[in-house]
């Protein structure tokens, strides 16, 4: 019920002031983390909201960008590394929804880009290319299935469920959602 209320409030806010869903999601994400903090901390957080390079979107302490150019997973990850980034790792439902919105804002829909998950070393032992803990999963029903023993990489927004699918890394999909850490500069309240 709370998520429905929040969704309705976000939709109403978009309609009333023309804010993008990404901006509202960033505000919502910050509000969750601020909780009972004082007014001074809220002002500092608001000042620190947009610390990503142009074309990147901030969620927490990371910046995300969508690249539509189709590549295999290894070439997509190599492209990310050349930009000082990695294919995205996903650590919560809220973060996954944010990534879906980043993709939708660039494509007008739900394309199926790569993210940084892979199990090429051992089947069903998943890792993120950025080395972070694989602590969240959002698989489509029946996945991961490692069809044909050759599906060690992950795409998002798969078919009608818009969840994850394990797939052959050599397939060509949009290069993916890229991420990089951002160093949050905290301004001391005066």
Curated annotation (Swiss-Prot):
Disulphide-bridged cysteine pairs: 153-169
GO molecular function, one term: carbohydrate binding
Leader peptide range in chain numbering: 1-18
Tissue specificity comment: Expressed in cells of the branchial epithelium, hepatic sinusoids, biliary epithelium, renal interstitium, skin, and sub-mucosal granular layer of the intestine. Highly expressed in caudal kidney. Moderately expressed in liver. Weakly expressed in gill, spleen, cranial kidney and skin. Isoform 1 is highly expressed in intestine. Isoform 2 is weakly expressed in intestine.
Single GO cellular component term: cytosol
Keywords, alphabetical: Calcium, Disulfide bond, Lectin, Signal
Domain C-type lectin: 60-179
Gene3D superfamilies: Mannose-Binding Protein A, subunit A
Keyword check for Calcium: yes
Stored InterPro entries: C-type_lectin-like, C-type_lectin-like/link_sf, C-type_lectin/snaclec_domain, CTDL_fold
Alphabetized PANTHER family for the sequence: MANNOSE, PHOSPHOLIPASE, LECTIN RECEPTOR RELATED
Subunit description: Multimeric.
Known role: Lectin that binds sepharose in a calcium-dependent manner.
The protein, known as: Ladderlectin
Organism expressing this protein natively: Oncorhynchus mykiss (Rainbow trout)
């Amino acid at each position: 019920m709370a998520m429905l209320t929040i969704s309705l409030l976000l939709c109403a806010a978009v309609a009333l002031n023309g804010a993008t869903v990404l901006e509202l999601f960033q505000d919502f994400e910050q509000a969750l983390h601020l909780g009972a903090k004082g007014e001074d901390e809220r002002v500092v957080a608001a000042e620190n909201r947009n610390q990503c390079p142009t074309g990147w979107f901030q969620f927490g302490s990371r910046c995300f960008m969508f690249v539509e150019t189709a590549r295999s997973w290894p070439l997509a990850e190599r492209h990310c590394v050349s930009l000082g980034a990695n294919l995205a790792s996903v650590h919560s439902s809220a973060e996954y929804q944010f990534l879906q919105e980043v993709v939708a804002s660039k494509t007008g829909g739900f394309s199926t880009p790569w993210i940084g998950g892979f199990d090429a070393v051992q089947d069903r032992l998943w890792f993120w290319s950025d080395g972070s803990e694989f602590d969240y999963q959002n698989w489509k029903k029946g996945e991961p299935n490692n069809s044909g023993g050759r599906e060690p990489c992950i795409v998002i927004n798969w078919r009608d469920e818009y969840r994850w699918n394990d797939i052959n890394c050599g397939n060509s999909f949009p290069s993916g959602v890229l991420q990089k850490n951002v160093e949050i500069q905290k301004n001391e309240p005066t």
